[in-house]
């Protein structure tokens, strides 16, 4: 199997503590084979699917599956919980400054042959995140018990390009793991 970089280049970048993307791309004209692969992958814990739907179309250019996050960040009540491969750390900090630092440190060079979403932080920001910015009374009962913010960093992505009929198998290698 041919990958996008040599072992020598990989080791050199790894020693420099540089985030890297390893990938393999294949032509796949039969979308039903891709759908079956997705059904299998989506059974994994903490996996997700995105469709890049535009202008009311049924299917957009890219179908993206992410799985196997190495880190998951939950923010709730000014506490960041970091799940680092099963090890949970609680960090009492300013959540907005922490998020800003996290996003600024998330630098990874995406090869031109790949879509820009080949490496990502994925998750949600709840409506209650506004309370970290403005002083708004919190009179509502918290009956959902979900974090104000949840972000994960998937190690593995499978991206199908519906236009070029190409599937990309991607492994993100992060220097801090």
Where are these regions (language model features)?
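Signature of the chorismate-utilizing enzyme
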Residues: 1-177
